[in-house]
């Protein structure tokens, strides 16, 4: 009996020892695995957040558009022909006079910077502007570059009087309706009448043809809408008008001169 009891006690001790062994092993595994999980959690928590990098938005810089707006000019050129004053030009009153024998070798388009012209008029006359410039220089006008005239030129001229002028003599006043059509580019009925009599009549059969050619040449140009120095003006014109790139231009105070041959191709202007 004692022997049996001893055997049972031994078996119990062995079972307890085995149970204790597996219990300790399980705790060890549990303890050793916990830090790994926590580290993983910590690693996930501590991972740096990479926010997407956005390149700074590129804002294109646009250079000021200095081109004259035709629509503004047209709006400013509304004038009732019924209020035209006496705009006829009398040849004998012209201080240069007539030259009907001079040849026509080429043409010069004369453009005028209207704000500069009007400043001179105001300096000279104050508030009492002559009628011929009241429309162009009056309040609320938006004229920039305008056409002074299209002048037939003598290549051998040594003075203004050597160029063709008044080739058909003293002509009658043109119809008001015809002049009104071109006030948008040449703001003055007397200006238009005078340019036709003095210059246009030397190379064109009619005033309509003359003014239409002026308008055609003018509309083919891109023009700045602010005052520029001589060099800046030449540079701007050549940059924005490829047909002028290699041409010699001329300028005088508030005027720009572009020359054309008899086939209406751009050519070099003579230096004088």
Swiss-Prot record:
Please give one Pfam family short name.
Ribonuclease_T2
Which superkingdom, per the lineage? Bacteria
Keywords tagged on the record: Endonuclease, Hydrolase, Nuclease, Signal
Which GO terms fall under biological process for this protein? RNA catabolic process
Which positions make up the signal peptide? 1-23
Where is the catalytic site?
A: 148, 195, 199
MF terms from GO for this chain are: ribonuclease T2 activity; RNA binding
- Matches recorded under InterPro entries: RNase_T2-like, RNase_T2-like_sf, RNase_T2_His_AS_1, RNase_T2_His_AS_2
Query: What family is it from?
Result: Belongs to the RNase T2 family.
What protein name does the entry list?
A: Probable ribonuclease HI_0526
Q: Which organism is it from?
A: Haemophilus influenzae (strain ATCC 51907 / DSM 11121 / KW20 / Rd)
């Amino acid at each position: 009996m004692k022997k049996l009891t001893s055997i049972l006690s031994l078996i119990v001790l062995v079972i307890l020892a085995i149970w204790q062994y597996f219990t300790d092993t399980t705790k060890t595994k549990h303890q050793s695995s916990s830090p790994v999980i926590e580290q993983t959690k910590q690693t996930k928590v501590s991972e740096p957040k990479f926010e997407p990098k956005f390149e700074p938005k590129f804002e294109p810089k646009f250079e000021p558009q200095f081109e004259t707006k035709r629509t503004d000019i047209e709006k400013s050129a509304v004038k009732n022909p019924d209020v035209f004053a006496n705009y006829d030009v009398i040849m004998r009153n012209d201080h240069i006079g007539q030259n009907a024998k001079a040849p026509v070798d080429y043409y010069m388009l004369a453009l005028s910077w209207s704000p500069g012209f009007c400043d001179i008029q105001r300096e000279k006359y104050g508030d009492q502007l002559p009628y011929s410039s009241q429309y162009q220089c009056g309040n609320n006008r938006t004229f920039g570059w305008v056409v002074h005239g299209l002048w037939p030129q003598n290549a051998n001229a040594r003075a203004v009087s050597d160029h063709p002028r008044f080739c058909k003599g003293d002509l009658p006043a043109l119809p008001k309706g015809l002049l009104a059509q071109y006030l948008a580019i040449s703001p003055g009925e007397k200006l238009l009448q005078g340019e036709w009599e003095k210059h246009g009549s030397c190379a064109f059969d009619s005033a309509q043809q003359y003014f239409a050619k002026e308008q055609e040449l003018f509309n083919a140009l891109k023009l700045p809408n602010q005052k520029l120095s001589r060099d800046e003006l030449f540079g701007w014109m050549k940059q924005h008008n490829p047909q002028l790139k290699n041409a010699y231009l001329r300028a005088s105070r508030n005027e720009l001169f572009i020359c054309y041959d008899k086939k209406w191709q751009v050519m070099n202007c003579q230096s004088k």
